[in-house]
């Protein structure tokens, strides 16, 4: 059901983009918008992981790294990938005091995970395993591709809306579908609608990744502790400069890296940490009654995406 919801939201976002093209240029504008959407998504499909890793200065690491904590991080990601039935991803570290992590890549065979130096320094080993299991859950669910496509289309809608606002008046009202009022409405409402859809997709995928990540690691309580520590640090700790410069990538991180974090609202990239922790605590109690299994997660594992289980 969660995958169906994501598909419907993505289809709606694409329709909004094509509709914006129609409002600006009629049938020709609609066709151009459709071609642009396909082109942008193809580019994102092949290059998004490289762009994001380069943007954050991610450095690939392996078991020969001189720091014991980094070697443990590499070993744990490799172990978690095996448990999840995934190929070994590229394992990277980003030099940032803010504790955070993300995953990227178009599919499990081309995936990469990144952890900040701040995260490796703040959390204990079980908590780091919980965080990286969450990121591998995103890889398993192909969320990295979904969110890349979503961000690309949402950004294009905003660009089209700005174009309509500044240049839409150059055409006669009779030639412009919707007229001047329609163009103004497009410029105001389209970016808001696109943002709402983008945020709804992102939040639903975070809940799902928490659930499957807890299954991969066999310890939902460790992930809950990690989220609480990261959130507490983020409220008063170092600013993620690169994320502030590129807010469109905020949804990639396990915790919203931006300084203007809010509650679990329509305009938030992530669910409220409190809600995520409560769901994980319930799941952790359930896991504890069965014992820590540490078993592999079946391919295509699915479930409800919210804190209600």
UniProtKB/Swiss-Prot annotation:
Region Disordered, residue ranges = 289-309
User: Entry's CDD domains?
Assistant: M48B_HtpX_like
Query: Superkingdom, according to UniProt?
Result: Bacteria
Q: Which GO BP terms, alphabetically?
A: proteolysis
Q: What detail does the entry give on cofactor binding?
A: Binds 1 zinc ion per subunit.
Task: Cite the binding residues for Zn(2+).
Answer: 134, 138, 206
What the entry lists under NCBIfam families is as follows: PRK01345.1, PRK03001.1
Q: What is this protein called?
A: Protease HtpX homolog
Which organism does this sequence originate in? Caulobacter sp. (strain K31)
Supply the gene name.
htpX
């Amino acid at each position: 059901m969660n995958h169906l919801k994501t598909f419907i939201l993505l289809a709606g976002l694409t329709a909004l983009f094509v509709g914006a093209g129609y409002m600006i240029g009629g049938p020709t504008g609609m066709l151009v918008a459709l071609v642009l959407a396909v082109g942008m998504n193809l580019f994102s499909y092949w290059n998004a992981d490289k762009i994001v890793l380069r943007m954050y200065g991610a450095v690939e690491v392996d078991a020969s790294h001189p720091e014991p904590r980094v070697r443990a991080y590499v070993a744990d990601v490799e172990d978690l990938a095996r448990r999840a039935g995934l190929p070994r991803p590229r394992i990277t570290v980003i030099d940032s005091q803010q504790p955070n992590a993300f995953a990227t890549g178009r599919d499990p065979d081309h995936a990469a995970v990144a952890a900040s130096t701040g995260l490796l320094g703040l959390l204990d080993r079980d908590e780091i395993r919980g965080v990286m299991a969450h990121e591998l859950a995103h890889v398993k669910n192909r969320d990295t591709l979904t969110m890349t496509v979503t961000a690309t289309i949402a950004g294009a809608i905003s660009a089209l809306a700005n174009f309509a606002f500044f240049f839409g008046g150059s055409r006669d009202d009779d030639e412009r579908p919707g007229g001047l009022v329609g163009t103004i409405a497009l410029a105001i409402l389209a970016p808001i609608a696109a943002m709402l859809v983008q945020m709804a997709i992102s939040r639903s995928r975070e809940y799902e990744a928490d659930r499957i990540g807890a299954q991969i690691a066999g310890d939902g309580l460790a992930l809950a502790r990690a989220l609480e520590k990261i959130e507490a640090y983020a409220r008063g700790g170092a600013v993620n400069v690169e994320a502030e410069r590129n807010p469109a990538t905020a949804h990639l991180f396990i915790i919203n890296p931006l300084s203007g974090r809010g509650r679990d609202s329509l305009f938030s990239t992530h669910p409220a940490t409190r809600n995520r922790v409560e769901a994980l605590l319930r799941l952790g109690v359930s896991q504890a009654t069965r014992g820590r299994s540490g078993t592999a997660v079946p391919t295509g594992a699915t479930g409800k995406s919210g804190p209600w289980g």
